[in-house]
Amino acid sequence: MPAMGTALPRAMASTASVSTSTGSSELSSLSDNINNPADISVIVIYFVVVMAVGVWAMVKTNRSTVGGFFLAGRSMTWWPMGASLFASNIGSGHFVGLAGTGAATGIAVTAFESHSFALLLVLGWFFVPIYIKAGVMTMPEYLRKRFGGKRLQIYLSVLSLFICVILTISADIFSGAIFIKLALGLDLYLAIFILLAITAVFTITGGLASVIYTDTLQAIIMLVGSFILMIYAFVEVGGYESFTEKYMNAIPSVVEGDNLTISPKCYTPQPDSFHIFRDAVTGDIPWPGTAFGMPITALWYWCINQVIVQRCLCGKNMSHVKAACIVCGYLKLLPIFFMVMPGMISRILYTDMVACVVPSECVKQCGVDVGCTNYAYPMLVLKLMPMGLRGLMLSVMLASLMSSLTSIFNSASTLFTMDLYTKIRKKASERELLIAGRLFVSVLIVTSILWVPIVEVSQGGQLIHYTEAISSYLGPPIAAVFLVAIFCKRVNEQGAFWGLMVGLVLGLIRMIAEFSYGTGSCLAPSSCPKVICGVHYLYYAIILFFVSILVILGVSYLTKPIPDVHLYRLCWSLRNSEEERIDLDAEDREENEADARTEEDQTEKPRGCLKKTYDLCCGLQRAEPKLTKEEEEALKKKLTDTSEKPFWRTVVNVNVIVLLAVAAFFYGYFA
């Protein structure tokens, strides 16, 4: 049996060959399925409608201020916010990754999605009220207000942008490229460039409001399209009972070859395929990791991740924010039916390809020697759906990819502009900040395209495990800092900084080791030292989280506390304080505001036609009237208001109980 040190380069080379080799004749012919008037018409209509919604949002919304561009002026209602939360989370990586892992191991992977409902409630009821009362636009900005200093803010901003590139953008582009290559037969980089260019147009011109409105449309398309595919898949397989029976017998016809002795467990469906909670030691997703590890990574993703939180910060009021979280919570219970089970059905219908285990056979089927599970969902779309509906499902994949990327681009530009650019250009005017945010999106596009070759050679196995593993190595220390920052006022800057540093080092040790040695497979176990890679990544997330908390609390209690006068409305115990807060970053903010006022006082120069057109597209055409001091105070009060009307507070609280009951039944049935 080859060691992983030699197996990894082989896997990397074969994965890279996807973009250069023709693959099997069957895959090459799949693109012919889309070459018909019905499918092409549906795709064209999709792009026209999405562009129309983007232009409508661009004209309708205020994009000429930082608050309008990045937070939609706190004017969004619950239903587009809820749809945007869902669409921002569900990228093409979910369709490819969840379906692929479902095909390989069963329904346990759905726990990564379904447990999110609880953290969405934590977000709406506990975290967002603090963020709004603090008056922040970004998560690093909250750390600066809470702890003072600049190193935490800069550290978290840089780390968040790094995570955007290696995790979110890379996974979405890789999975989207798989589908687009099969469906359209386009060159990989040409397809990616076109998609990223269209995505960037919405983000650069429209701001957050445009992103949310297009996300709402994308969410509707995703839900309708994936529901139709689910119906077709279950009809084809003969219903649910037939599905459960046939899946357990979906064994590939070729299980020997390449001079390998292949264990039956590598190609036989697992006995616990239809259970979410699995053995604590031998399970691929152990139940303690599901119960305790997943909530930690979900805490980082749903309550601290800029992409998600930014959508909640733009709500009209707290009732709208909570209602949006509830809507998204309901929608997060659907992936098991819309993505995971269709992936399992794909294994039944196309067993020799989706469940291939012999490396040479996998190369013959899909051009990759480490497995073809990532092709489970695209195969269903291209071979099962009739004309017209294939175009609809391609639109679904485009929608999931573009909605996720628009969200990432907008939030990443917010992080760069508000947390990093203002450190470089302290005297930047509001106009300059808006332009800088839009230009940074262009930089992200270039970075994303350059990252594609790295993604190709890194994704030999199941995509969803890659994304969750990276989240488990980088997310827990951030989750620990924000959790104790909000719920323990004794924590100070020194504790938070060293907790993040220790957690980052431990996380990078595991992540770099896995990149170096590989994660292994059923055929070739990893040669990574057991002391580093011997525990499941979800268990490692638990260890990271509690080590970070111990360091944060230990250092904080050994150093001076932050006086309460700096913490009013920044932590839970002081959330309702009426006293005036003296921000730890007050001097920096006053200096920046004075510099901004100096530039804004300059007279506006006459503009030509080209300049006016450019300003119209970028939301810079209207010079907002200067607010009086009273108007500034009123605006600040609106942006930091967390009050609710009693009736609507009761309505959302009742809906929480209903959601919890539905989720309890869901887990009780599938556990």
UniProtKB/Swiss-Prot annotation:
Q: Name one GO molecular function term.
A: proton transmembrane transporter activity
Q: Looking at the record's lineage, which domain of life comes first?
A: Eukaryota
Composition bias of kind Acidic residues appears in: 583-593
Start-end of Basic and acidic residues biased regions: 594-604
Name a biological process GO annotation: proton transmembrane transport
Topology Extracellular: residue spans: 60-65, 111-116, 181, 240-288, 346-378, 456-467, 516-537
Question: Per its record, how is this protein called by name?
Answer: Solute carrier family 5 member 4
* UniProt similarity note: Belongs to the sodium:solute symporter (SSF) (TC 2.A.21) family.
Q: Name one GO cellular component term.
A: plasma membrane
Q: Where are the transmembrane segments?
A: 39-59, 66-86, 90-110, 117-137, 160-180, 182-202, 219-239, 289-309, 325-345, 379-399, 435-455, 468-488, 495-515, 538-558, 651-671
Has the keyword Transmembrane helix been applied to this entry? yes
NCBIfam families noted in UniProt = sss
In this chain, the stretch annotated as Disordered covers 583-604
Q: Where in the cell is it found?
A: Cell membrane
Say yes or no: keyword Cell membrane present. Answer: yes
Tell me what organism the protein belongs to. Rattus norvegicus
Cytoplasmic topological intervals? 1-38, 87-89, 138-159, 203-218, 310-324, 400-434, 489-494, 559-650
- Which keywords appear in this protein's UniProt record, sorted alphabetically? Cell membrane, Membrane, Transmembrane, Transmembrane helix
User: Membrane topology for this entry?
Assistant: Multi-pass membrane protein
> Signal peptide position in this chain?
none
Outline what the protein does. Generates D-glucose-induced depolarization in a pH-dependent and Na(+)-independent manner, with activity in acidic conditions (pH 5) but not neutral conditions.
Q: Listed disulfide bonds for this chain? A: none
Q: Identify the InterPro entries for this entry.
A: Na/Glc_symporter_sf (IPR038377), Na/solute_symporter (IPR001734), Na/solute_symporter_CS (IPR018212)
